[in-house]
Amino acid sequence: MKVITGGVTAAKGFQAASTAAGIKYQGRTDMAMVYSEKPCVAAGTFTTNIVKAAPVKWNQEIVYKHPSAQVIVCNSGIANACTGEEGFSYCRATAKAAAETLNVDENSVLVASTGVIGMQLPIEKLSDGVKAMAPKLKGTLEAGNEAAKAIMTTDTVEKEVAVEIEIGGKTVTIGGMCKGSGMIHPNMCTMLGFVTTDVCISKQLLQEALSQDVKDTYNMVSVDGDTSTNDTVLLLANGMAENPEINEKNEDYQKFCEALNYINTTLAKKIAGDGEGATALFEVKIIGAESKEQAVTLSKSVVTSSLTKAAIYGHDANWGRILCAMGYSGAQFDPEKVDLYFESKAGKIQIIENGVAVDYSEEEATKILSEEAVTAIADIKMGDCTATAWGCDLTYDYVKINADYRS
């Protein structure tokens, strides 16, 4: 596997465009379009929140009931959530505008929104934005990067990644972009992820690959414990790499899954590290677990703990907060067998052995916790299973950003 520069336009046949439609933000781009020269098999995973935004419902219809997709249109600023039938009609109107402009099937157009809940979209601006983007579609890396910028809300940086692998003697490329900074606790940010690939693969296996991978990537991220109404990951495969079709779980499928995991893990960590007001990526590894489920429950409990996140911001080795978060997680373990370590590029230090603090250097611990990426490793000594969750520290700026979000 080779990591390359790029995002959604890295794979063959994919183009992107962006525009400033003035939907809510002024003086910046706020709409993005991704287009494939050929129809794609599509896969998707969506929020588990009972309150689902209109675009989520629209995309579920397209992904699950139609054979192909070819376009993604995304706006930032307004979420189109809790907007009733009118909100759903705006999804249809957006798809219709894209279909007419690009000469594709209306049922091949996926739509996504992120922003403030409860506001209706200005449909004229949305339609005008679609028409403005279509002639600007390009397959350049710059076009993909600009699209990644257009879907940002409180994000501080665009998020994209791409890789190349070889399948059946052909070069296969996978690229992706995402946005997410606050309201991140997906269980399928607002968390939106768009991944494109030129691999030739069956629709069923594409969906299986994505559904399985999301469990270990995006679903292991928590910035603030809030599960958005709009969480969506879409994966399009147009087959233009011309590899032999992957239609069984063979070596080629595993190779594709490994590359997809790299894409999604990288994007998930970028979301966690760019949490609203964050100064550090906080990673929690549970090792020695009896089951995967136990490890997942424990790691997510720690990474979601506000007190632990505040301690990470203060570079404070307050291990009691970690043990406490593990204790109320609902997972069973023996606290008197837990070993705990902190690790960063500044080094690694043991804090607890068999549930009791060791004689460690507070100065050394603070040094390790002062880096931009910090890992807590808890060994519960019950088995061989592991899980890793990602989050960020909790800062004063998180409250400031969210107190002013609608203004």
Model-based region annotation:
Residues 1-75, 79-89, 99-407:
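A structural signal for small-residue-enriched, beta-sheet-centric alpha/beta enzyme cores
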Residues 95:
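Generic structural marker for isolated residues within well-ordered, non-membrane alpha-helices
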